[in-house]
Amino acid sequence: MNEQKMNEQMKKTAKTSGQKGPGGRALDRLTLKQDEARPVQNTRVEAPRVTYTIRDESEISPETEEDGFPDGYLECIIRGEFSEPILEEDFLFKSFESLEEVEQNLSRQVLEASSLLESSLEYMTKGTKQEKTEVTQETPPLRVGASSLLAGGPAEKPEGGVYCGVLSMLECPQAGCKKKLRGKTALRKHMLVHGPRRHVCAECGKAFTESSKLKRHFLVHTGEKPYQCTFEGCGKRFSLDFNLRTHIRIHTGERRFVCPFDGCEKSFIQSNNQKIHILTHAKAGKKC
């Protein structure tokens, strides 16, 4: 009876094999245990053959060299801490490129500045040359006239014909003054006489047109003569240094002022004496 019940139960489980409940699961466990209890057949399982190639350290392919990152670096990339691998070689290469660009820019700026300087110097030299040529073309050659000699100062005898017509006298335009003067400079100086006399002496009331003349006149009242001749046996004193210099020429024999006319060898210590001598040539009508 027990065996019949067992068979019926087995049939029921076979019919309901599509729907596994708790009983089905238990049956599965039972069958697994029965399978484990069975003897294992002698089956030969071959292990997979793994071949390893050992290369020298010098023989590294470019693929392994490019992908040869450290493990920690790869972990950082996987985590997302680094977006792109940054190599030291790339950084150095970029820095060298930037330095080369800077050097090129500097050299370009230096070349531009030097070319600009050369062009400006060339322009300046051209301008000065043109100005010199214009001045030499327009300006006639100057000669030393009698007016410069009459103004005083040492001079050599000029060539003949220089003083022809130069000694023409200029008449004072002031009414009642018939004085004639040599040149415009002498005339301007003479016109100060006719001007207002603003500089008045406090001692005698004499007025002067220039302050320098008032100072010179005031030495007459004071009697001051600070300039003394140092030559032995002379000892003369003068109120002005100009008079002392003129006096010293008497001792030295220096005659700086030479007659400018040809054939006349006269020379003078003072410029006033030279001017008076030149007038004698003009009055005599001596031709140049």
UniProtKB/Swiss-Prot annotation:
Tissue-specific expression: Restricted to testis, to germ cells in the early stages of spermatogenesis. Not expressed in spermatids, nor spermatozoa. Expressed in embryonic stem (ES) cells.
CC terms in the record's Gene Ontology section: cytoplasm; nucleus; protein-containing complex
Keywords on record: Activator, DNA-binding, Isopeptide bond, Metal-binding, Nucleus, Repeat, Transcription, Transcription regulation, Ubl conjugation, Zinc, Zinc-finger
Subcellular location(s) of the protein: Nucleus
This protein's name: Zinc finger protein 42
Biased composition (Basic and acidic residues): 1-11, 26-38
InterPro entries named among the record's database cross-references: Znf_C2H2_sf (IPR036236), Znf_C2H2_type (IPR013087)
Stored Pfam families: zf-C2H2 (PF00096)
PROSITE patterns reported in the protein's UniProt record: ZINC_FINGER_C2H2_1, ZINC_FINGER_C2H2_2
Known role: Involved in the reprogramming of X-chromosome inactivation during the acquisition of pluripotency. Required for efficient elongation of TSIX, a non-coding RNA antisense to XIST. Binds DXPas34 enhancer within the TSIX promoter. Involved in ES cell self-renewal.
Keyword Nuclease attributed: no
C2H2-type zinc finger segments: 170-194, 199-221, 227-251, 258-281
Primary localization class, coarse: nucleus
